[in-house]
Regions:
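Patatin-like phospholipase
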Residues: 1-38, 46-169
């Protein structure tokens, strides 16, 4: 039987779709030997490699903005005093100028669900793409290229959106 590689894209909203694709591939018994992704695609790829479909499905069923980033309540609260669109834009702008959105909640979520040892022992390879701000170019890595104990750091770096606080490795 043929073996296949799976590539997941970045873009937060695509994440739940990608889990649906994974489910369909499992139901069709299509053998996956490698998964590559960037941003949310790298995060989902890690879940595929460790084989935890139910955990991934649960995350995507229950996830909220607060599970990903620490956002001022006024930005999300439709009833807040910052009711105008421009007030909200200005709050976001100030946050970005102040160093970016804090994604500690996402890091905490990954630490609770990602099992680096399981991923490293899996016969399925994991590839991810992140970006070097020093060299100003993409960095492509497979799990064997990532120093032990730093997989979550690299996943966070891959998921780093320009409005987020940068993840330095």
């Amino acid at each position: 039987m043929e073996e296949f590689g799976l590539v997941f894209a970045g873009g937060g909203a695509k994440g739940s779709y990608e889990i649906g694709v994974w489910k369909a591939l499992m139901e069709l018994k299509i053998p996956i030997i490698a998964v590559a992704g960037t941003s949310v695609g790298a995060l989902n790829g890690a879940m595929v490699v460790q084989g935890d479909f139910e955990a991934a499905k649960s995350i995507w069923t229950d996830i909220s903005v607060q599970d990903v980033m620490d956002v001022q309540k006024d930005i999300l609260d439709k009833e807040s005093s910052a009711s105008s669109f421009m007030d909200r834009i200005n709050m976001i702008k100030e946050t970005i100028i102040g160093g970016g959105l804090d994604v500690t909640p996402l890091s905490n979520l990954l630490h609770s669900v990602i099992d680096e040892e399981k991923i490293r022992k899996s016969p399925i390879d994991l590839g991810l793409v992140t970006f070097s701000l020093t060299d100003f170019k993409p960095v492509r890595l497979f799990k064997d290229d990532i120093p032990e104990g730093q997989l979550i750091d690299y996943l966070m770096a891959s998921a780093c959106f320009p409005a987020f606080k940068p993840k330095e490795i």
